Amino acid sequence: MVTSTKIHRQHDSMGAVCKSYYQLTKPRIIPLLLITTAASMWIASEGRVDLPKLLITLLGGTLAAASAQTLNCIYDQDIDYEMLRTRARPIPAGKVQPRHALIFALALGVLSFALLATFVNVLSGCLALSGIVFYMLVYTHWLKRHTAQNIVIGGAAGSIPPLVGWAAVTGDLSWTPWVLFALIFLWTPPHFWALALMIKDDYAQVNVPMLPVIAGEEKTVSQIWYYSLLVVPFSLLLVYPLHQLGILYLAIAIILGGQFLVKAWQLKQAPGDRDLARGLFKFSIFYLMLLCLAMVIDSLPVTHQLVAQMGTLLLG
C-alpha cells in the first residue's frame, strides 16, 4: 500500500497518484483492442448484440489489457529508464514502486477473470487470462529481448480480443473468430515494424533486437510488404468462404486494403523515409478501426434489408 508520506513525496495529490497508475496501463493501446472485441461480438450476434454483455466484456477486456501492460512496465523498467522516450513512465521515474505496480497488475487480472467468468462465461475469462500470460511470459519475457521475430509471435497476444468477444456471445470458437485472430496477427508486424523504423535507435541503445536493428531498414520494409500482402486477402475471408459479411464490408475492405498496400509499397521503395514509416503506422491504426466499423455496420439487420432492397431495385 502506498503510504501518505510516499504519496506526499512523489505526488502532489491523490489525483496524481491515480494518474501514475493509469499511465502504467498504457491506455492509448487499449481502445484498439476493444474495437476488435466489439466487432467480433457484433458479427457473432448477427448485429443483435446484447448491450449489457457487450459492456461487461469490454470492461473485462480493458482490465485484462491494463494488467498485461502494467506487468510489461514492471518487467521493462530497466530499459524504460535507459530510453529517453520512456524514462518518464511511472516506474523508472520513481512515481510508483514495482511491488505496488505488481499488486495493481495482479488485482486487475483477477478482477478481469472474475468479471468475465461470472457475468459472461468461463471461456471468455480464460481467453482474457491467456492473453495476459502470453503477453507477459512469451512476448515480454522470452521473445522481446531475444529474437528479431519477437513481434511476429508475440502478436498473438494482441490477436486474442476477437476470440474473447466471440466466446462471450456464443460460448465457443468457430472458424470466424480464428480468421479474425489471424487477420490481426498478420496486421501486427506491418503496424509495429513501421513504428520500430521510427524509433530503432532507441531499441539499439538498450539492445532490444527489433527487426530494423538486427536486419536493417530494407529487410524490414520487405517484411512489412509481405505481411501486408497477406492482410488484405485474409480480411476478405469473412465474405468468402465464411459468408459472415456482405457486399458493404467487401467494398470497404477492398478500398482500405488497397490503400494499405499503396503505403506499404511506398515505404518499400524508400526504406529510410521516416515520414512514410510514420504514415503507414498511423494508417494501420485507421485501417483496423474502419475495418472493424465496417464489420459492425455490415452485420446489422437494417444493413441487410437495405442491401436487399437495393439489389431488388437494380435487378427490377
Curated annotation (Swiss-Prot):
It catalyses: heme b + (2E,6E)-farnesyl diphosphate + H2O = Fe(II)-heme o + diphosphate. Its EC number is 2.5.1.141. It is found in: Cell inner membrane. Gene3D superfamilies: UbiA prenyltransferase. Belongs to the UbiA prenyltransferase family. Protoheme IX farnesyltransferase subfamily. Converts heme B (protoheme IX) to heme O by substitution of the vinyl group on carbon 2 of heme B porphyrin ring with a hydroxyethyl farnesyl side group. It comes from Synechocystis sp. (strain ATCC 27184 / PCC 6803 / Kazusa). Carbon 2 of the heme B porphyrin ring is defined according to the Fischer nomenclature. Signal peptide: none annotated. This is Protoheme IX farnesyltransferase. It is a multi-pass membrane protein. Pfam families: UbiA. Its main location: membrane. Keywords: Cell inner membrane, Cell membrane, Heme biosynthesis, Membrane, Transferase, Transmembrane, Transmembrane helix.
